[in-house]
Amino acid sequence: MKILTLNTGSSSLKFTLYQHKNTQILASGTIEKIKTKKSIIRIKTQNDLLEKIDKHIKSHKEALKQLIKILTNKKLNIINNLNEIQGIGHRIVHGGPNFKNSVILNENILSELEKISALAPLHNPTAIKVIEITLKIFPNAKQVLCFDTSWHQTMNENAFLYATPYSWYKDYNIRKYGFHGLSYAYITKRVATILNKHKKDLNLIILHLGNGSSINAVKKGISYDTSMGLTPLEGLAMGTRSGDIDPAIIPLMSKVLNKTPRKIEEILNKESGMLGISLKSNDLRDIWEGVENNEYNSKLAVEIMAYRIKKYIGSYLAILEFNIDAIVFTAGIGVTDYGIRELSLKGFEKIGIEIDLQKNNLAREKNIESDISSEKSKTKILVIPTNEELTILEDTYNLITEHSRDLK
């Protein structure tokens, strides 16, 4: 069975075409900077044929048309026709309170998804447009929605509720949802294999560190708490997001700057975090260069990021009652930035969590798994590249095959 996974961003479209039988990647790539004159299409085929195409792509609809041309291009030899694709798995950022697992798409599901678009206004409406287009392009393929929030639906009320009026939760669904769930699901499954343990016996602290970052406490193989909240703005100091702040800052700065609350929220999302503190970049590689050049704000940005991470690790150790099997670093920064890993775990050796500095310094490659714990460490410290697409692939395949059995 050939399955296409689609990860729709507000201005991008990431795709992978799999042959499920052996999880072989037939083609993968990204279409970036959609809606601009500097759109870029990057493609990699199973023969490692690389293609880069510069093209003005005005919309996600046009991006999908370009994707179809790529997949059916005889020169690339990926597929002969679109009917070969039997399943499509969509990553959906926000599933709201009702989508606790991945689901096969139908009219009722699509209607329910439209109702919660306000919870993720930058991502869900665009994803819905892509779904509607793929329904027309692939009328015979089963489509599956995989939600980044579903993984965290196992959290208890005392973890996901805010201490706001209870009616806000009951009437308006105001609560912590958490994100990066597809990544956490993959990492948890992978750690179970690495440690040769049943997933239900695992207690983990997983750090998904990228331009958007979060931490997940996993207890008995399921999500117990996470740092992001109703939206991805809560939690750690990130590339451009502030993370945790006093909410009174919003009306205060709205008045001081004579800007609307929505504009202040935009600043907290797009002009804060590492970019806001460093005064130069949201990219930690640029910021580390600033540290080497003794730039005060670059040094401060790194310290703030590591300090926030350390606070969350400490609090999650407490709620897991100091009984954890591993601390896992994943995503772009988590896998490649040895400096952030070292700073974030400094001091934890006093409670048996000790990093091996030499192993840590060598763990910089994007696609390599590493054990960076010292021989003395009572807790494993692992670096594992994430694979959200593989989670989407497995969920899509499993739901389609279950659906086919039910019809027999």
Curated annotation (Swiss-Prot):
Pathway: Metabolic intermediate biosynthesis; acetyl-CoA biosynthesis; acetyl-CoA from acetate: step 1/2. Its cofactor is Mg(2+); Mn(2+). Mg(2+) binds at residues 7, 388. One of its GO terms (cellular component) is cytoplasm. CDD domains: ASKHA_NBD_AcK_PK. The keyword Kinase applies. Substrate binds at residue 91. Mg(2+). Can also accept Mn(2+). Disulfide bonds: none annotated. ATP binds at residues 14, 208-212, 283-285. Homodimer. Belongs to the acetokinase family. This is Acetate kinase. It comes from Borrelia hermsii (strain HS1 / DAH). The lineage of its organism: Bacteria, Pseudomonadati, Spirochaetota, Spirochaetia, Spirochaetales. The gene is ackA.
